[in-house]
Amino acid sequence: MTTTERSDPAIRHDWTVAQVQAIHDMPLLDLVHRASLVHRAHHDPSDIQRASLLSIKTGGCPEDCGYCSQSAHHKETGVARQRLMPVEAVLREAAAAKAAGATRFCMGAAWRSPKDGPDFDAVLAMVRGVRGLGMEACVTLGMLTPSQAERLAEAGLTAYNHNLDTGPDYYDKIVSTRSYEDRLATLQAVRDAGIGVCCGGIIGMGEGVTDRVAMLQVLANHAPHPESVPINALAAVPGTPLGERPPVDPFEMVRMCATARIVMPRARVRLSAGRRALSREAQVLCFLAGANSIFYGERLLTTANTDADADAQLLRDIGVPVPAISALEAAE
């Protein structure tokens, strides 16, 4: 636990699943009100971070995650395997994202775990380059060894994303090639290296409410809390085992954002995949409930994202300052 967490009575690391579920199951208006109070006590409500996400190495992943279009196990998703992007190309994308208003640049590689060598060295150069632009840098590369986490920390990495996906009791129905303990070990290596943890999960995969809140309980009981918690709604991709799942009720996203905010008061709650399916009003309700970050740009790895100009207009409409330049203009 950090010194800041010790001095804040709202920070806890002893939640039970039943306690977290009792919060999640509150009447929705009461839940949003409570989450909003916690949010305003710990954050500027007009500060909604824009992060940009780029797939720097796409497809061919040996993992069998049931939701993922990049798994080599799912042959009919239409995602072709590609090599790692050149460093210079990635940094051009980062510069365009910064010009469009993003303050964090996230890079994802479809690996089970990175191998030491030229590709990992290139990722380190990308991290250094993004930091040199004055942006926060986040990567998601799969499982890490402690020495790899230390090298990323030395390169200046702000945060490492490694999602738990769901609660521990439902996890093996989604993934069989990587255990829950594997994921927790990588998160510990990241913490030990002094890198911020970005960790959340996905709803809409057939799990129950208890599985959702169990995931939040695991995260909230880590010390320190993750610096950011992505809340994703399943983007059902044809050709994956979960490709026929129905869409998530928007109120379920609101509940997850609000619950995450209450049990992890200082974390950034990142409204992530599935946001494209939410109305403007549903997104604003998520912001009121404590979400204070979005992915800004046309794509989230291999799936479409909300139009960048529409995002800019929404943020302006609710009083959040954004640059006048659009993402499309920045890339030209």
Curated annotation (Swiss-Prot):
Look up the EC number in the record and give it: 2.8.1.6
Pathway assigned to this chain's UniProt record: Cofactor biosynthesis; biotin biosynthesis; biotin from 7,8-diaminononanoate: step 2/2
Q: Answer whether the UniProt record assigns the keyword Metal-binding to this protein.
A: yes
Record protein name field: Biotin synthase
Q: Where does [4Fe-4S] cluster bind?
A: C61, C65, C68
Q: Where is [2Fe-2S] cluster bound in this sequence?
A: C106, C138, C198, R270
User: Which species is the source of this protein?
Assistant: Methylobacterium sp. (strain 4-46)
Cofactor binding summary note? Binds 1 [4Fe-4S] cluster. The cluster is coordinated with 3 cysteines and an exchangeable S-adenosyl-L-methionine.
